[in-house]
Amino acid sequence: RDPEMSRGLGDVYKRQAIIDAKRAGEIPSAELALVVASNASAYALTRAENAGIAHTVLRKEKGEAPENYGERLLALLRENAIDVVVLAGFLTILPENVIRAYDHRILNIHPSLIPSFCGDGFYGLHVHEAALKRGVKVTGATVHFVNEITDGGDIIAQKAVEVLPGDTPETLQRRVMEQAEWILLPQALEQVAGEIAKKREEKQ
């Protein structure tokens, strides 16, 4: 079971890419069980409603300790028997207790070929602006596990995308989404979910 966690235009399409891939039979090892948004106005909730996926909002209260928020999130994940978490623009930083509890079971996608253009400050259009400024000829996307270091977890999969003459951050962002992110994320989810299912079968 896999919860998707929520934001932004690109993130909306990432979630839809997962939903579409599941409908097409491309993610047989995972059930899309829950969408958790940190913002009640997140369009992820509408997407989930339209797809018949359970969804909820879990806000971090003002002044709430990260560990306490993490315990509330963990309780929600355990209540829904969640095995794998896919981050898609979830606005609240994941507390360390959640990362520890779901070690190598939280997936994130980053719009560059890590280790290039990643880490603190590299998000959204900033990534593509940096790639164009550096003059790279190839960029892409990376799906990786989440750990305590921003974009620092083990790499699951990468896909390269050509940078074209005349590209702007916006055109490059769109190409990376269409040619890499929307393809790579469902594939990585199936890979990880399949490995979890296989290990579970071997224990039986």
PLM segments and residue spans:
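Single conserved hydrophobic/aromatic residue that forms the stacking wall/gate
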Residues: R1-L9, Y13
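Short, structured coil segments at secondary-structure junctions
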Residues: G8, A51-G52, Y102
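Short, well-ordered alpha-helical microsegments
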Residues: R15, A44, I93-E96
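Short, surface-exposed acidic-centric catalytic microdomains
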Residues: P28-N68
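Charged helix-capping and loop-helix junction motifs
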Residues: N68-L74, Y123-V127
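Glycine-rich phosphate-binding loop signature in dinucleotide/nucleotide-binding domains
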Residues: L76-D83
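Donor/substrate-binding cores of folate-linked one-carbon enzymes
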Residues: V84, A88-A197
